[in-house]
């Protein structure tokens, strides 16, 4: 809600980072992040996707307030300084994890993501199972980064990709092959077919 996101955004807008707010299934980026997007050290396909799929806003806080919108998720991308350390990442991470109302995870390439503490992929899987009338123990989830931990733990079978982080592999029931070696297909063949 606005009371939760306003102080967080006020802090983030003072940092030298790229950020996206996801609202109603669409991505919005503060106009000042146009420059930081060019500095990101992610594959060009990801950078192009970030740049071309976001609506740029002159004043994101005003946009949220005037339209009474709820931010579903924020993604933050960091770029490296000359010494290779990610500019502002540790400062931002400490700020975010100190807030018990949100959950902060790493979703890949130099990024952090946060949502409300009660909103994660695991909650989503349990809700979907409930809607479909499926026992959560009869579900399988596959992931590779920290933002997949909740769904891997919620699923009846949690599968880590071969290229997953060590934390994901440690919590998974099974480790499949990598994403470049059809790991999802291998897991489906192993458990379902």
Residue ranges of model-derived segments:
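Glycine/small-residue-rich loop that forms an oxyanion/phosphate-binding "nest" at active or ligand-binding sites
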Residues: 1-6
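Conserved acidic, metal-coordinating active-site core of Asp-based
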Residues: 7, 11, 15-17, 22-142
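Mg2+-dependent phosphoryl-transfer enzymes with acidic/Ser/Thr/Gly-rich catalytic loops
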Residues: 97, 112-193
